[in-house]
Design a protein with these regions (language model features):
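Catalytic cores of carbohydrate-active enzymes across secretory and cytosolic contexts
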Residues: 1-253
Length: 253
């Protein structure tokens, strides 16, 4: 949906996303959706699926979109279903017990850097085996209580879909990810403004927003250069995984 702001001579168009507000009885679902623990917990994943199987499939198994688009009628049905509410409480209790386990202090902390992380289909920041392996490292660190902090990129454009041109040529179509519909949180300063990293580069400074992904007990921080403090040449650094020319690849690395 587009929202027109008409207080200027020329119309300004802004994106407007219509979402559902969760009742207080269902707020635990929101916390579960914002931590990828459910990805490798079968009861957590099946809980989201059973809230609305059709919407779960159409959302690409994205619990954030699922909860945003869950109808008020369906919410009422869930809250009236004692078995479902007990199930939500059970999964949430499992999650809290998992998160309460202390981190190991007998080993050094680990900083892990990767261009891609394969964690779930909803977060399109990986391409193949390397990303899946990196994602598995984080999950295993979480299960083992190993103190790890992971760093990567939040790519504006995720996977591409292919189509054919009129002359039979394959065309790669990239659709931008809507960060408001992803299981991520923007890192903010104490004053409430977005945190901005400054990265020195020959002749200029590149600026980066930071987004946090909760992966069980682990934190994955993703950098994003696609905002107006950067030039158009630097905004594309985090547009695509392994995308662009060699200079852009060097910038990413």
């Amino acid at each position: 949906m587009k929202l027109q702001v008409s207080n200027t001579n020329a119309p300004t168009w802004r994106d407007l996303t219509v979402t559902s507000d969760l009742p207080s009885k269902l707020k635990h679902l929101e916390e579960l959706a914002k931590n990828l623990w459910w990805v490798w917990n079968s009861e957590g994943k099946s809980l989201f699926r059973d809230l609305n199987p059709d919407l779960w499939r159409s959302s690409g198994e994205n619990p954030v979109i699922l909860l945003q688009q869950l109808s008020s009628e369906r919410m009422d049905e869930i809250m009236a279903d004692k078995a479902m509410m007990d199930r939500i409480d059970h999964v949430y209790d499992m999650f809290k017990q998992y998160m309460a386990k202390p981190m190991r202090k007998d080993i050094p902390s680990v900083s892990y850097f990767s261009m891609e992380y394969g964690l779930c289909n909803a977060l399109k920041i990986y391409s193949g085996g390397l990303g899946v392996l990196a994602g598995d490292y984080i999950k295993e660190a979480s299960d083992s209580c190993v103190p790890m902090t992971a760093v990567g990129f939040l790519y504006r454009f995720g996977y591409f879909t292919q189509s054919l041109s009129v002359d039979g040529q394959q065309i790669a179509n990239y659709e931008p990810q809507n960060f408001n519909q992803l299981p991520i949180e923007q890192v903010m300063e104490e004053n409430g403004r977005p945190m901005i990293l400054e990265v020195p580069y020959p002749g200029r400074t590149i600026y980066s927003h930071v987004w946090r992904v909760n992966v069980g007990r682990m934190k994955l921080y993703l950098m994003d250069t696609d905002f107006d403090m950067n030039s158009e040449f630097d905004r594309v650094i985090t547009h695509q995984l392994y995308g662009g020319d060699w200079e852009n690849r060097i910038k990413q690395e």
